Amino acid sequence: MDIIREIESEMLRKDIPDFKPGDTVRVHFKVIEGGRERIQAFEGLVIKRRGKGLSETFTVRRISYGVGVERVFPLHSPRIEKIEVIRRGKVRRAKLYYIREKIGKAAKIKELFEAPQKEDNIQEETNA
């Protein structure tokens, strides 16, 4: 079993930002149409993350022309170019399936405001 974990750990991506359900993300992924390859962005609310290791996936939901669209992305897929965290959401659930029934303003997630880091002050105090 350790051999499998070793091989999987080599394939894991290191450039994935820290995000969780409730966050709004923009996923840039490669789409192959015919012989052409282009990058397409999909922005929406993360409603769940599941699994671990190489098989970890996350589901992003957005409303497009009045219709809810959900897309499941493998987290460590080579087709994902990058993941941007647009805003952090304040939720108390790991799976946000209840958002599917909500419409309009009721489907909004409160934004989580983080205090700015004070790394500069800490470094100045240690140098003095």
UniProtKB/Swiss-Prot annotation:
Pfam families: Ribosomal_L19 (PF01245). Belongs to the bacterial ribosomal protein bL19 family. GO terms for molecular function: structural constituent of ribosome. GO terms for cellular component: cytosolic large ribosomal subunit. Keywords: Ribonucleoprotein, Ribosomal protein. InterPro entries: Ribosomal_bL19 (IPR001857), Ribosomal_bL19_CS (IPR018257), Ribosomal_bL19_sf (IPR038657), Translation_prot_SH3-like_sf (IPR008991). This protein is located at the 30S-50S ribosomal subunit interface and may play a role in the structure and function of the aminoacyl-tRNA binding site. GO terms for biological process: translation. NCBIfam families: rplS_bact. This is Large ribosomal subunit protein bL19. PANTHER family: LARGE RIBOSOMAL SUBUNIT PROTEIN BL19M, RIBOSOMAL PROTEIN L19. It comes from Caldicellulosiruptor saccharolyticus (strain ATCC 43494 / DSM 8903 / Tp8T 6331).
